[in-house]
Amino acid sequence: MATPHIRAYRGKRIHMIGIGGSSMSGLAQMLLAQGYRLTGSDNLETYATRGLRDMGVPVTIGHCAENVHGAELVIYTVAILPDNPERVEAERLGLPTLERATLLGQLMEGSPVAIGVCGTHGKTSTTSMLAQALVVAGADPTVHIGGSLDFIGGSTRVGAGRVFLTEACEFNASFLHLRPTVAVVTNIDEDHLDFYHDIDDIQDAFRRFLKLLPKEGHAVGNGDDPRVTALLQELDCHTVTFGMGVCCDWRPVNLTYDARGCASFDASRHGKTLGHVTLRVGGFFHVYNALAAVACAWTQNADIEKVCEALSQFEGAHRRFERTGEIDGVQLYHDYGHNPAEMRNVLSVAKLQPHNRLWAVMQPHTYSRVKRLFQDYLTCTRDADITLVTDIYAAREKDPGDIKAIQLVEGMRANGLTAVHTPTFDDTEDYLRKHWQPGDLVLTMGCGNINQLNDQMNEHERAKEAGPM
């Protein structure tokens, strides 16, 4: 069966399986803005599913075959396995289906400037920074972010300009469905090892993505990452580098950090300062993200002073070291970081915030990732005073039976960390409430549903304050 094209289904009913996912919910909003009729389903009720329902999209919680009845096109993500009852029923009925990444590629078609931001870490923050910068600079871009940015009112923006900006996710090599004219590569590291054989296989996927660029296109890459620079040297298109190294095209000059880890620097190209950035988000990694945004905006002839002004106003994307509330004098934060490098990075920022004790609440994500990066998990929360570990979030995987969260906890203790296994959200909340003290900071981390623990604790606190009905 030929791959269906989304443009043939305007005015027809489209059903989206897993509509509450960070990318899928954004694509749903984009399709809705363009006049498509949508329904959707997800296995959990979340702020994303509630938000879509408020926009008029019928969303069913729970997957069942009947959900696809009456649909003329079914869209799914790679996280929705072939044995999902809705996918099974769509196949039985002979309904055309479209994978999320293919849909994104189709929506980008025809854009004179198609920017894909890829990398193992920092995609969402870099895309969000670049989106805000391009809007302020007057480019009026269409945007798709795998997260939510208040500045654009959510995860998508439909603009009237020449630019289509999106995250380009390397999981399952889905970014190969895109056709970028500009690519930004933040870094290349080990991840998604349930799909890739090893780091060389990962690098080769990025190679194939960059090879999609036309000769007149631009590749913007981290000049401090040897795997990224090696790929840039293979390209025939224009290349631009950013980083701390003296050989990078864009560098931060007069770089300083405030007490909370927020950087201030001059954005310098080939030794010439073109703007000044004072970030409101902490962490050395955000210097790289901001430089990537500046360098990419420069390829589009954007006013760099306006770009830097926009970056200085950037407040961060949701689920990226996001403060979610305060209970009993304890500050609650959440971050999407789900592999050891990301957890280590965000904890380096958390420890700079005023606090008594720092709690790290880790939801390990997928059995394959935990197995392949096991040793790195054992020390990545060393900056925390106490680490709580929930059960592993399976996501798209089935439990192999040979890896458990308690093994992580035992390994952490062997490495001198204070670690506790709290299997469920109820277990975790109960432990926190019994042991936290005013002035503590609690950071939950993971890309599964661990953010719902923050929601749960806040809801319970509001109910307690309201008293008995």
Language model regions located:
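Nucleotide phosphate-binding/pyrophosphate-handling subdomain across enzymes
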Residues: 3-15, 23, 27-34, 111, ...
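Phosphate-binding loop of NTP-binding sites
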Residues: 5-7, 30-33, 53, 67, ...
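N-terminal leader/targeting and accessory segments in enzymes
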Residues: 1-103, 226, 248, 282, ...
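Beta-strand->loop->alpha-helix junctions that form or flank phosphate-binding loops
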Residues: 41-42, 60-63, 98-105, 144-147, ...
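Conserved hydrophobic helix-helix packing surfaces used for dimerization/oligomerization
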Residues: 14-16, 74, 115, 141, ...
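Structural beta-sheet core signal
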Residues: 16, 40, 143, 183, ...
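C-terminal helical cap/extension that packs against the catalytic core
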Residues: 378-438
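Short internal beta-strands
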Residues: 36-43, 219-223, 359-363, 384-394
